[in-house]
């Protein structure tokens, strides 16, 4: 299976997109442009949507992207912008599926939505943790039939806001939007020594609906809750976005 890859950067949105046909790159760019316009225009009129760390009510006539992000915020008890990266990955894949794309992976700063017709391994990137680059999650093709979300939050890697210090909180869900907000929310509980922090994260994860499972990595320690894909050894020291294998 041959994949075509392109990095798409439009303002703050930086997507690594892999597709089975290069014609889908233009569609993805149009999706980003249109949805960014909806988001930016709404924020101009409602700046609290951008700055709030708590869930924000939005009207029924708000753009779909706004309602999706707000829903994810309420589901995980965080501000709607906690879901922004996963939202763009999700909307890109949904649009490509509607246009008969069979295989596509959209990665936006560690927040992934993918649809593949064969089993796929996604690598774990967890900063300086010894587990980083050595573990991957093997997803079955049946799980990705309508798109699937794998989103990671970190208190030690990247520029996203996290109140905790876990190396990685990876959340699995049918929705990358829900998964992104959940990862941020769970990551905020990663405080204290590694074992205690991981337990706090897993306890928080139990309170969040619409997610399949969570994998938490902190230093030499890790924990999981719920149903996560099969863990496999990868032996690859690469950033998460570059570790995709069709198996």
Swiss-Prot record:
Alphabetized Gene3D superfamilies for the sequence: ApbE-like domains
Against InterPro entries, the record matches this protein to: ApbE-like_sf, MA1715-like, UPF0280
**Organism superkingdom:** Archaea
Homology family:
Belongs to the UPF0280 family.
Name under which the protein is recorded: UPF0280 protein MMP1236
What is the native source organism of this protein? Methanococcus maripaludis (strain DSM 14266 / JCM 13030 / NBRC 101832 / S2 / LL)
Q: What is the lineage of its organism?
A: Archaea, Methanobacteriati, Methanobacteriota, Methanomada group, Methanococci
């Amino acid at each position: 299976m041959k994949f075509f890859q392109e990095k798409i950067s439009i303002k703050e949105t930086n997507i690594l997109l892999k597709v089975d046909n290069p014609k889908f790159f233009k569609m993805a760019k149009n999706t980003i442009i249109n949805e960014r316009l909806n988001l930016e225009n709404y924020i101009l009129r409602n700046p609290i949507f951008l700055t709030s760390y708590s869930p924000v009510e939005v009207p029924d006539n708000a753009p779909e992207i706004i309602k999706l992000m707000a829903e994810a915020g309420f589901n995980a008890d965080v501000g709607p912008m906690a879901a922004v990266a996963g939202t763009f990955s999700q909307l890109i894949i949904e649009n490509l599926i509607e246009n008969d794309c069979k295989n596509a992976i959209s990665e936006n700063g560690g927040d992934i939505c993918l649809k593949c017709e064969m089993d796929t391994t996604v690598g774990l990137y967890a900063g300086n943790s010894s587990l980083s680059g050595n573990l991957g999650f093997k997803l079955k093709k049946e799980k990705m039939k309508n798109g699937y979300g794998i989103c990671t939050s970190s208190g030690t890697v990247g520029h996203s806001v996290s109140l905790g210090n876990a190396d990685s909180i990876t959340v699995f869900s049918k929705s990358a939007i829900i998964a992104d907000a959940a990862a941020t929310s769970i990551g905020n509980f990663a405080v204290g020594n590694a074992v205690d922090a991981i337990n706090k994260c897993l306890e928080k994860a139990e309170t969040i609906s619409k997610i399949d499972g969570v994998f938490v990595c902190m230093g030499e320690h890790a924990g999981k809750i719920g149903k996560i894909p099969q863990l496999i050894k990868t032996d690859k020291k690469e950033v998460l976005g570059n570790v995709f294998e069709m198996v």
